[in-house]
């Protein structure tokens, strides 16, 4: 009598929690097998250490009683699983598996936390798509598109309800003249690498003689340089995510840099930037920000969590789109964790919902 009741109970548990557990029968004993999740960190960019901090926060806030977590480090030399004692177990790239204690570990899903290439530009996503491993971020095409600021601007500009600043793109091996650049765009401008996961190589240019050094600086980081019209105003950034088919916005943050702009130092040095969450903006501006952010998220077919940056222009009170960050930082003091807490949620629930969407 007990055994049939137990079997029915286990089937009920599996029905209620289909995303988290698999159960089996061995030697007459039922057992639960937790989903095996790869937490992927590292990468090839200057934000390698930031990625390790992000994955540390994610690991701390995922329930080890529900998931088996495997930290996977990717760098230019190797892909490996880092065990609790610091040992390195090689990843079999043929099927994204591990050989651990004589057993083959097949990973069920990936929680990606790599900033910059290959985790933010679609390369890693393309690999996971080919071998059939679900992951928490945008797909390979959307990741590649949003990583290229110029291409993303051109696509978003077609949405109608989103303002885009004027810009010019330069290519490293294509001749250009400063005169032609200044014919298309007026000073003041920002000069930045077109494809970069960090804020390195960015300059604010207020005089013509500053333009060429700024372009040279940006070309050291990338083969493409984007020159964008400077919009004076308040920088606002908002987390957006999708759960069960519904797009949600987190409370936005205003970024107030003590530097001239939000550069690499301002981004990662304590005390250089004030981050106000939630931002002190009117209900009308908040409604516009949410609407435009959801529009961009939906039309680009984003997945998981992204962060979308805007400038609220001082003179017109219009919102200008800056960029989509498909791999926002997740360290304890990063913007998304701030916004999750401001929304009254805890990171454990938030990250768990990201995994539930793909399992």
Residue map of PLM features:
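ATP-binding N-terminal substructure of ATP-dependent carboxylate-amine bond-forming enzymes
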Residues: 8, 15-16, 22-23, 29-147, ...
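Conserved metal-phosphate-binding beta-hairpin within the catalytic cores
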Residues: 229, 297-330, 340
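Active-site "cap" helix and flanking loop/linker of ATP-utilizing ligase/carboxylase catalytic domains
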Residues: 254-306, 335-359
């Amino acid at each position: 009598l007990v055994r049939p009741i137990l079997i029915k109970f286990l089937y009920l548990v599996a029905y209620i929690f289909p995303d988290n557990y698999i159960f089996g029968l061995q030697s007459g004993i039922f057992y639960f097998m937790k989903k095996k999740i790869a937490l992927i960190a590292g990468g090839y960019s200057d934000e390698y250490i930031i990625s390790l901090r992000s994955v540390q926060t994610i690991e701390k806030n995922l329930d080890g009683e529900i998931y088996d977590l495997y930290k996977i480090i990717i760098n230019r030399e190797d892909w490996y699983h880092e065990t609790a004692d610091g040992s390195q177990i090689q990843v079999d790239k043929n099927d994204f598996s591990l050989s651990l204690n004589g057993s083959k570990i097949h990973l069920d899903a990936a929680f990606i936390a790599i900033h910059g290439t290959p985790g933010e530009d679609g390369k890693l996503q393309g690999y996971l798509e080919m071998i059939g491993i679900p992951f928490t971020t945008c797909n390979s095409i959307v990741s590649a598109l949003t990583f290229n600021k110029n291409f993303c601007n051109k696509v978003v500009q077609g949405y109608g309800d989103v303002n885009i600043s004027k810009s010019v793109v330069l290519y490293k091996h294509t001749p250009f003249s400063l005169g032609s650049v200044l014919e298309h765009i007026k000073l003041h401008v920002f000069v930045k690498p077109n494809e970069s996961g960090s804020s390195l190589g960015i300059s604010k240019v207020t005089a013509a003689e500053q333009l060429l050094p700024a372009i040279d600086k940006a070309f050291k980081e990338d083969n493409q340089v984007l020159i964008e019209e400077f919009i004076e105003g308040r920088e606002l950034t908002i987390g957006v995510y999708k759960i069960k088919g519904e797009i949600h916005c987190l409370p936005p943050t205003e970024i107030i840099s003590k530097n001239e702009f939000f550069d690499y130092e301002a981004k990662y040095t304590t005390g250089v930037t004030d981050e106000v969450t939630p931002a002190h903006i009117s209900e009308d501006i908040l409604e516009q920000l949410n609407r435009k952010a959801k529009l961009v998220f939906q039309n680009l077919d984003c997945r998981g969590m992204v962060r979308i940056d805007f400038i609220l222009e001082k003179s017109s009170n219009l919102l200008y789109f800056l960029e989509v960050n498909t791999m926002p930082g997740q360290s304890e003091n990063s913007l998304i964790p701030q916004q999750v807490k401001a929304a009254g949620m805890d990171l454990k629930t938030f990250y768990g919902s990201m995994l539930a969407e793909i399992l």
